[in-house]
């Protein structure tokens, strides 16, 4: 059942990305972030009330840090989705396991450990080779800044995932983590809309059309439902199965790009995306195996 939950989450996240790209014709990225948080928090609050959950927390600073890093990552990814082909933006954003691997190697080097895992080095090398192949059209079309934002969003997403795990270990339920994240979305989106330069045309807020309002509602609803499905998958499924099946989001996004925007990629772009996908799966496998070994070692020492 967990496999179905992660497939549903990946499908909904890909639809959300497509809706963000469509909505960018009528709204700024700041507005989309704001409404994503507003619609999502209303739906989530109704769910929490129905389930009898509580929002009071003793870990507010942790939630704010996670929310701040998460919303910057989300903002960068939304921006990238408006500038790049959807599949390319999603692929770069899904590189979190690679950045985690880079951090693990950097930490090992900092601690003076002589042995550095060769599988991780290989995965990192292959992934960056894939990035160079996939980035070529972006540089030719002067889309390098959007590509940079997509890559950085993946870096911050890796940090945000680490903070989510820490909050979970502290006893915070996932709905509470998501609620405070959405609250930060609202605050950041509102602030970004009011700042000078928040919108390309200078307008802080744009009037709603039926199409625009429908897209915003869909972005908020699909985002929160995808998050809940993802949570259920991680809670009930095996780590490796869930982690690897989430990459189906790249496939779904490729389909939307072809159907809606008629995206056509050269062979080297497809090869680059495949290399990134394969190396991310390998890094996920190795990272998970390393965490299991570390947990077993801690259990044996107690």
Task: Please identify what each model-predicted range represents.
Residues 44, 138-201, 207-208, 299-302:
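Transmembrane alpha-helical segments that form core, pore/gating elements
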Residues 1-9, 49-78, 145-153, 203-225, ...:
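Loop-to-transmembrane-helix transition segments
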Residues 102, 116-136, 268-287:
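Hydrophobic transmembrane alpha-helices of multi-pass small-molecule transport proteins
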Residues 89-95, 171-184, 224-259:
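Helix-helix packing/entry segments at the starts of transmembrane helices
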Residues 1-31, 125, 141-166, 296-302:
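Glycine-/small-residue-enriched transmembrane alpha-helix faces in small-molecule transporters
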Residues 1-2, 27-72, 99-103, 126, ...:
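Transmembrane alpha-helices of multi-pass small-molecule transport proteins
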